[in-house]
């Protein structure tokens, strides 16, 4: 019997897969426990529509991420901070600070978890990588200047 999985089933497949299961297993276990539904023509059509909608949504998100990466490319974030001895900062500049500065300077709201940068403790020019989407990332310059 062909069934559409509603949840991940260890021995059969992942949610949304169209699989062949024995009649007894499907009727007595999968369908009553709402792990699967019978693969009727209508259900298969609905499944295909859902998969197509998900594919379009992912494509749209990828395009938006690429636009954001393009707009961030070549941007420079400037920090003016108080300096102690030997050009060292009081404290440090982290990905959270970079995220806040991006919001302040360019009005771009980027989560701090998406910013990969070493902890900055001295003046100079550094590079921070921003991973916008799994396949899309860009780099921005971080300038730390004396106040």
Curated annotation (Swiss-Prot):
Q: State the InterPro entries in the record.
A: Ribosomal_bL9, Ribosomal_bL9/RNase_H1_N, Ribosomal_bL9_bac/chp, Ribosomal_bL9_C, Ribosomal_bL9_C_sf, Ribosomal_bL9_N, Ribosomal_bL9_N_sf
Lineage of the species this protein comes from: Bacteria, Bacillati, Bacillota, Clostridia, Eubacteriales
The alphabetized UniProt keywords are: Ribonucleoprotein, Ribosomal protein, RNA-binding, rRNA-binding
- The source organism is Clostridium botulinum (strain Langeland / NCTC 10281 / Type F)
Give the family, as the similarity comment puts it: Belongs to the bacterial ribosomal protein bL9 family.
Give the protein's biological function: Binds to the 23S rRNA.
Molecular function in Gene Ontology: rRNA binding; structural constituent of ribosome
In terms of Gene3D superfamilies, this protein maps to: Ribosomal protein L9, C-terminal domain, Ribosomal protein L9, N-terminal domain
Query: Pfam families given for it?
Result: Ribosomal_L9_C, Ribosomal_L9_N
Stated name of the protein: Large ribosomal subunit protein bL9
Query: What PROSITE patterns does its record include?
Result: RIBOSOMAL_L9
């Amino acid at each position: 019997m062909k069934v559409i999985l509603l949840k991940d089933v260890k021995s059969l497949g992942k949610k949304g897969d169209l699989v062949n299961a024995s009649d007894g297993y499907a009727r007595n276990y999968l369908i009553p426990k709402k792990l699967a539904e019978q693969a009727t023509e209508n259900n298969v059509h609905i499944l295909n529509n859902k998969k197509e909608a998900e594919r379009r949504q992912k494509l749209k998100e990828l395009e938006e991420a690429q636009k954001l990466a393009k707009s961030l490319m070549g941007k420079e974030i400037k920090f003016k901070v108080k300096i102690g001895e030997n050009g060292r900062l009081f404290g440090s500049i982290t990905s959270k600070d970079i995220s806040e500065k991006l919001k302040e300077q360019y009005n771009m709201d980027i989560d701090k978890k998406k910013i990969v940068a070493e902890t900055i403790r001295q003046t100079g020019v550094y590079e921070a990588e921003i991973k916008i989407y799994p396949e899309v990332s860009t780099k921005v310059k971080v300038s730390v200047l004396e106040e």
